[in-house]
Design a protein with these regions (language model features):
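C-terminal capping region of solenoid repeat domains
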Residues: 1-4, 17, 44-45, 64-65, ...
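Intrinsically disordered, low-complexity regulatory regions of eukaryotic transcription factors
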Residues: 22, 26-29, 100, 128-131
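Acidic/polar low-complexity surface segments
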Residues: 86-88, 99, 114
Length: 233
């Protein structure tokens, strides 16, 4: 009898309250367990995800399926972080292709794929073609090439910051194209890239107010005319 009373009390909780409670939970494992309690709790978990404007999978062991399943429920999402961490967010081109069909992708203002070594230009281009509202993009530590930058230049007119940390297959052509076409671009991180210093001179010629990170690059550009010695990883 006692068990029946407890279930009745749970049933009396309104969905809005359940959704609010679940929105305070940051552990996706806990959310998954809560969704299995009963049908009403599952609905509460789904509504809590639908209200979220930020999702970060950094630090969680996610794959294409689990990532896309959660993002598909997050209709109001504005900021998405699926950076690879020590546990590894194993997103691939297939996952990016699936994400590109999510309802929230067109409204994303911030997206991080930092360190996602399982992705290539193919997946990035597919997703970027739909993420046309991006203002902040981090694709550092990946193996993208100029092809991805050309897609960014064509699809992201609102872009303000771009992190290309360690993207050693990107060349001067890709950088110039992005800076030239993304007219709202304010900062770009080029740490660890294999490009000559005169490339940065060209970028500053196109957009004098552009902040090039790390900050020391601009100082060297203004005082020397040689190739930078970037750290090897």
């Amino acid at each position: 009898m006692r068990r029946g009373v407890e279930e009745a009390e749970i049933d009396r909780l309104p969905i809005d309250l359940l959704a609010h409670i679940f929105s305070l939970i940051t552990c996706f494992r806990d959310l998954a367990q809560a969704s299995r309690v009963c049908r009403k709790w599952k609905q509460g978990v789904e509504e809590s995800l639908a209200r979220r404007e930020k999702l970060s999978f950094s630090g969680w062991k996610m794959d294409d399926e689990s990532t896309t399943r959660l993002v598909f429920l997050a209709y109001s999402l504005k900021e998405l972080d699926i950076s690879r961490s020590r546990w590894g967010c194993q997103i691939t081109d297939y996952g990016l292709h699936q994400l590109s069909t999510a309802k929230c992708i067109g409204n994303l203002s911030s997206f991080s794929l930092w360190g996602s070594t399982g992705i290539t230009d193919k997946g990035v281009i597919q997703l970027i073609s739909r993420a046309t509202s991006l203002e902040h993009l981090n694709i550092g530590g990946t193996f993208i090439t100029d092809a991805s930058l050309f897609a960014i230049a064509d699809s992201c007119p609102r872009l303000k910051s771009l992190v290309l940390w360690g993207c050693r297959q990107v060349t001067e052509d890709g950088l110039r194209t992005v800076v030239n076409k993304c007219r709202k671009l304010e900062s770009i991180n080029v740490w660890g890239m294999r490009v000559p210093l005169n490339c940065f001179t060209a970028l500053l010629t196109i957009r004098p107010a552009l902040q090039i990170e790390p900050k020391g690059v601009v100082t060297v550009v203004l005082n020397e005319n040689r190739f930078p010695i970037w750290p090897i990883y």
